[in-house]
Amino acid sequence: MTEKNQDAVTEEQGTEVVLQIQRIYVKDVSFEAPNLPHIFQQEWKPKLDFNLSTETTHLAEDLYEVCLNISVETTMEGSEDVAFICEVKQAGIFAISGLEDVQLAHCLTSQCPNMLFPYARELISSLVNRGTFPALNLAPVNFDALFVEYMQRQQAQEESKAEEKEKKEVH
């Protein structure tokens, strides 16, 4: 595949769409195991709390930083003792051109995090392994579905605001 083909995601109305990774890096990482070593004496029945969010920063024309924030807290069922807390901020700088509005938002909140997730997942797995806990393999995340849910919530909020405004104007 040529470089031109790699950079061109799609072509719309004669405008070439470009999504190019400039750099992928770890912005922040934390691993805590506050109840070691006695947690190893308990039967391993973990309860996992997984949180995920993204942050986007416009750095320059057609240049964006996307940061994927993942937090995993594992407690023991029954005792509620914290086994470990792992937090990773995996970021990347992306050159994006040829997209506007909803398409750009989709790229920044779905396609870019989708590229970052394998790096974050591997880092979390490695940190948990170094803590000598059983393997933790995070399931893939459907960022497209999360984006659709977000857009539906935004649309519902806009419709709700429009209805409230309409009610106020009637009274």
UniProtKB/Swiss-Prot annotation:
Compartment(s): Cytoplasm
SUPFAM superfamilies: SecB-like (SSF54611)
GO cellular component: cytoplasm
Keywords: Chaperone, Cytoplasm, Protein transport, Translocation, Transport
A GO term, aspect molecular function: unfolded protein binding
Key word Acetylation present: no
Domain of life according to the entry: Bacteria
Biological processes, Gene Ontology terms: protein folding; protein tetramerization; protein transport
InterPro entries to which the protein is assigned, alphabetical: SecB, SecB-like_sf
UniProt KW Zinc keyword: no
Role played: One of the proteins required for the normal export of preproteins out of the cell cytoplasm. It is a molecular chaperone that binds to a subset of precursor proteins, maintaining them in a translocation-competent state. It also specifically binds to its receptor SecA.
UniProt record similarity statement: Belongs to the SecB family.
NCBIfam families referenced in this protein's UniProt entry, alphabetically: PRK05751.1-4 (NF004393), secB (TIGR00809)
Subunit description: Homotetramer, a dimer of dimers. One homotetramer interacts with 1 SecA dimer.
Entry protein name: Protein-export protein SecB
Species this protein is from: Histophilus somni (strain 129Pt) (Haemophilus somnus)
